[in-house]
Amino acid sequence: YTLTVTLLQNGKTVDEIATRFGCRSFAIDPQKGFILNGKPYPLRGVSRHQDRPGIGNALTAKEHTEDMDLICELGANTIRLAHYQHSQTFYDLCDERGMVVWAEIPYISRHMPGGKANTISQMTELICQNSNHPSIVVWGLSNEITMNGASDPSLLENHRALNDLVHKMDPTRPTTIAVLSMCDPGE
């Protein structure tokens, strides 16, 4: 759906904004798996980077649609949008095609103790810009962030802060992280 809000002054439009939204329900159950609109919905997924040879990240609607068509041709119904905010065009395509989306911020590979403010800003913007997309069902906090180990107290604190922020801004969606197992078993 598209919701349009118009600001009138003396009967004339002085501002107008439109936003897309949709309605759905989901649950994640340890025994039943992913449940979409009350029914089991097995997830078959891909991970997507938003780039192409020769044009980098400057994809047009044509390339986004080509990517979505290929993803659908594979039979996928789930997309992890790695590792950064993607184009609104692609989020809209995900909504239109009924995809289940994992959206995440660029908090990748190695934790930078001085980078907390940046991760908080990135997550805030991701949620503010995309919370109306019904295709997004999970917010990703980080990707393979334990490459230097998982025992750094500031890494753990940053994840707690991000997790708390997400649940404050959007209590309807869970959080997740992608983990690379390069940690000692004791960490």
Residues covered by each model-derived region:
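Extracellular glycoside hydrolase catalytic/binding regions
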Residues: 146, 156-187
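Active-site-adjacent substrate/metal-binding segments within catalytic domains
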Residues: 4, 8-160, 175-176
